[in-house]
Regions:
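Nucleotidyltransferase catalytic core that binds NTPs
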Residues: 1-209
Length: 209
């Protein structure tokens, strides 16, 4: 398997396969996970399989650095839902560094800590196609690209290009979002099959959304 590294200007083949490297290969999928849903899990699992990664860490943020701050629920609920969602799924785990650090979750700060803590690990930071366009605005992006390899995931009806190095991965298109799940709940509609059943059971038990 060869992996394409795409920018608007270049198209090159990366060989050998990532999994043949001796260093540990770890993907990171960050997000608010408010709540986690099946599209999150499919993305994490497909990236892990297609790139031959050792594992993918789902990393809940404490406070997103966006200007339009998200309204979110307490982190212990989001963390518990993640634990329920990945239980028994091979190759998926949770990274809680941003919840532990608290404050605004800048990716550069987080990855600086992780790379220093785990010098034998190569990190692959997974983002949606919509976020690729915003890479030039990311905090300390030119230093961040030295710490991680970005992995772009195609999203329905969205195409992106960037001059930054991004490995593109195709996954089954599922137009599901956390806001969709919350809207369903607010309307009294059960979001069946949009998220793992244990997560839905937890939401109903705790009266979330």
């Amino acid at each position: 398997m060869a992996i394409e590294l795409l920018t608007p200007f270049t198209k090159v083949e990366l060989e050998p396969e990532i999994k043949e490297k001796k260093r540990k290969q770890v993907g990171i999928l960050g997000g608010n996970f408010n709540p986690v849903h099946n599209a999150h899990l499919i993305v994490a699992d497909q990236v892990r399989q297609q790139l031959g990664l050792d594992q993918v860490l789902l990393m809940p943020e404490y406070q997103p650095p966006h200007v339009d701050k998200k309204e979110t629920i307490p982190e212990h609920h989001r963390l518990k839902m993640l634990e329920l969602a990945i239980e028994g799924i091979e190759g998926l785990a949770i990274e809680t560094i941003e919840l532990e650090r608290k404050g605004i979750s800048y990716t550069y700060d987080t990855m600086k800590i992780l790379t220093e803590k785990n010098p034998d690990t190569d990190y692959y930071f997974i983002i949606g196609a919509d976020m690729v366009d915003y890479l030039p605005k990311w905090y300390r992006i030119d230093e961040l690209v030295d710490l991680v390899q970005f992995v772009g995931v195609q999203r329905p009806r969205y195409k992106a290009g960037t001059s930054y190095p991004v490995i593109w991965v195709d996954v089954p298109l599922m137009d599901i979002s956390s806001s969709m799940v919350r809207d369903f709940m607010a309307q009294g509609r059960k979001p069946n099959f949009l998220l793992p059943q244990p997560v839905l059971d937890y939401i109903e038990k705790e009266g979330l959304y």
